[in-house]
Amino acid sequence: MTHSVQLKILDKRLGSEFPLPAYATTGSAGLDLRACLDEPLKIEPDETCLISTGLAIYLGHSNVAATILPRSGLGHKHGIVLGNLVGLIDSDYQGPLMVSCWNRGKEPYTINPGDRIAQLVVLPILKAQFAVVEEFELTERGAGGFGSSGQN
């Protein structure tokens, strides 16, 4: 399934010096977002920096949203994760896409201009329509909380 997304290039290096967002493989769910920096940016341990991706998107339909997610290698190898853990882009947002990068590692980490820093995933959205009830239908799990379904 595909969905047309309007893309506005805010940094002219995108498409020339830096590739436009693209799926790395046919099975990729996320499009890589790049750091549109003028110079390398050193992020000290426990520091958070807001980094421009150089683009804005408009999803255009209320049944679609996008998320900005971390790149697994940056988090696992270098401790670089998203400062807000996940970014939610509503269908009617038209502003610039920014990435909050947090260095939760023990060493400084340098992000260079054009580095892949996050990924954008476009998702279908179902609008909830609440039905107020006195009791829920019985399920096997019931109201069991954290850890109630076991480890296996």
UniProtKB/Swiss-Prot annotation:
Protein origin, superkingdom: Bacteria
Cofactor or coenzyme needed: Mg(2+)
Pathways involved: Pyrimidine metabolism; dUMP biosynthesis; dUMP from dCTP (dUTP route): step 2/2
Pfam families membership: dUTPase (PF00692)
Gene Ontology BP terms: dUMP biosynthetic process; dUTP catabolic process
Keyword Magnesium assigned: yes
Residues annotated for substrate binding in this entry: R71, S72, G73, N84, L88, I89, D90, M98
InterPro entries in UniProt: dUTPase, dUTPase-like, dUTPase-like_sf, dUTPase_trimeric
Annotated GO MF terms: dUTP diphosphatase activity; magnesium ion binding
Keyword set, alphabetical order: Hydrolase, Magnesium, Metal-binding, Nucleotide metabolism
Catalysed reactions listed for this entry: dUTP + H2O = dUMP + diphosphate + H(+)
The protein's Enzyme Commission number: 3.6.1.23
Enzyme class, spelled out: hydrolase
Cited HAMAP family: dUTPase_bact
Task performed by this protein: This enzyme is involved in nucleotide metabolism: it produces dUMP, the immediate precursor of thymidine nucleotides and it decreases the intracellular concentration of dUTP so that uracil cannot be incorporated into DNA.
Family per similarity comment: Belongs to the dUTPase family.
The protein's name: Deoxyuridine 5'-triphosphate nucleotidohydrolase
Annotated organism of origin: Coxiella burnetii (strain RSA 493 / Nine Mile phase I)
